[in-house]
Amino acid sequence: MRKIIHVDMDCFFAAVEMRDNPALRDIPIAIGGSRERRGVISTANYPARKFGVRSAMPTGMALKLCPHLTLLPGRFDAYKEASNHIREIFSRYTSRIEPLSLDEAYLDVTDSVHCHGSATLIAQEIRQTIFNELQLTASAGVAPVKFLAKIASDMNKPNGQFVITPAEVPAFLQTLPLAKIPGVGKVSAAKLEAMGLRTCGDVQKCDLVMLLKRFGKFGRILWERSQGIDERDVNSERLRKSVGVERTMAEDIHHWSECEAIIERLYPELERRLAKVKPDLLIARQGVKLKFDDFQQTTQEHVWPRLNKADLIATARKTWDERRGGRGVRLVGLHVTLLDPQMERQLVLGL
C-alpha cells in the first residue's frame, strides 16, 4: 500500500509578504492587480477571507467587500525563492516529488526510512521544518492514493494535517461529497445530484456502464474515485505543458454576448492558475475551446507571449462566427501552452 502526502502551503503569496513585513500580519491583505487595470486577486490572507475576499475575484469586488484591504502587487522572485527552499526540504525525505505549483506538491514516501517509515510523522516533520526554516505554515494530507491525499490536505487548514489510513478509506468515501473530488465542478455536481448521486457511497451503487454512457471517460474516473481507486503515480518527471479552465453550461448558449460573459468570468481563474505555476505569465500560445450541442468541439490558438484577455476574446469571437454553424454551445474553455524550458532559457539569455 502506498503512502502519499499532499503538502499545500497556507495562503502562500500572502504568507511570504506577512513574514517579510510583520506589520501586515493582522490586517486584511491580498496579492493582485489594481482596480484601475481591472485586476484580479491572486491570494488573500485569512483576515481578508473573513470579509469574503477570495482568489480569482476581481479586485474591484474585493475592495467593495473589504474597503480597507491592503493590495500588494506581488514579489514573484521572493515566492519562487521560498518555493525552491520548500522543494529542497521535500527532497530530504524522498526523491519522488511531483510539484503542482509553487505552493503545493505530492510526495510518495512509501519507501522512505525517515520517522520509522511513518507518513504521518514525515508530514508533521516536513511542516515543522518548513516553519523553522522559512517561518511559513503548511497543511498536509496523508492517504494511500493521490486524490484522497489532496482532499485530506484541505481538511484541517490552516497549519494542520489530516490522515486517511487504508482501513479508514471505505468509511471516509461513504459520506464524501462528489463535489470534493478534483475535477467535479459545479455543473457536474448539479447533474449528479439530479440523478440522486451526492456522495461516493451513492456512486458505488451505480452501474459502471450507465456512468460511461452518461458521462463518457469522466464516468469511469468518477466510478474509480468513488471506489477509492487512483492508480496515478507521483511523477517526479512531470513537466506541466498547459494550464486551462472551462465551463460546461447547464443549458446551451446561442448568443455571442453569453459566450463573452462566460469568458469574462473564466479569465480571472485562468490568470490565477497560471500565476501559481508561471508567476511572470509568460506563455507560448493561448487559445479557446468551444464544444457544441452535438458534442463536436473546436479549438483555436494564437502564438502570444503573455496572457492577454483581449486576444482570447477576439479569438473566441472568430471561432464563434466561423465554426459554430448555428449550433448551441455547451462548453467554453480557455487555455495556455507554457514555454518549453529550453526555449525559455534561450529567450532569457537572448535578453
UniProtKB/Swiss-Prot annotation:
One Pfam family per UniProt: IMS_C
Outcome, altering residue 310 to S: In strain: ECOR 57B2, ECOR 59B2, ECOR 60B2 and ECOR 62B2
UniProt subunit comment: Monomer. Interacts with beta sliding clamp, which confers increased processivity.
Catalytic activity entry: DNA(n) + a 2'-deoxyribonucleoside 5'-triphosphate = DNA(n+1) + diphosphate
Cofactor info, note text: Binds 2 magnesium ions per subunit.
Induction notes from the record: By SOS response. A member of the dinB-yafNOP operon. Induced by hydroxyurea.
HAMAP family found in the cross-reference section: DNApol_IV
Outcome recorded upon mutating residue 49 to A/F: Loss of function
Enzyme Commission number: 2.7.7.7
Cofactor(s) required, per the database record: Mg(2+)
Subcellular location: Cytoplasm
Domain of life from the UniProt record: Bacteria
Gene: dinB
Domain UmuC: 4-185
Keyword vocabulary terms for this entry: Cytoplasm, DNA damage, DNA repair, DNA replication, DNA-binding, DNA-directed DNA polymerase, Magnesium, Metal-binding, Mutator protein, Nucleotidyltransferase, Transferase
Protein's UniProt name: DNA polymerase IV
Physiological role: Poorly processive, error-prone DNA polymerase involved in translesion repair and untargeted mutagenesis. Copies undamaged DNA at stalled replication forks, which arise in vivo from mismatched or misaligned primer ends. These misaligned primers can be extended by Pol IV. Exhibits no 3'-5' exonuclease (proofreading) activity. Overexpression of Pol IV results in increased frameshift mutagenesis. It is required for stationary-phase adaptive mutation, which provides the bacterium with flexibility in dealing with environmental stress, enhancing long-term survival and evolutionary fitness.
Domain text: The catalytic core consists of fingers, palm and thumb subdomains, but the fingers and thumb subdomains are much smaller than in high-fidelity polymerases; residues from five sequence motifs of the Y-family cluster around an active site cleft that can accommodate DNA and nucleotide substrates with relaxed geometric constraints, with consequently higher rates of misincorporation and low processivity. It lacks the O helices present in high-fidelity DNA polymerases in the fingers domain.
Consequence of substituting residue 8 to A/H: Loss of function
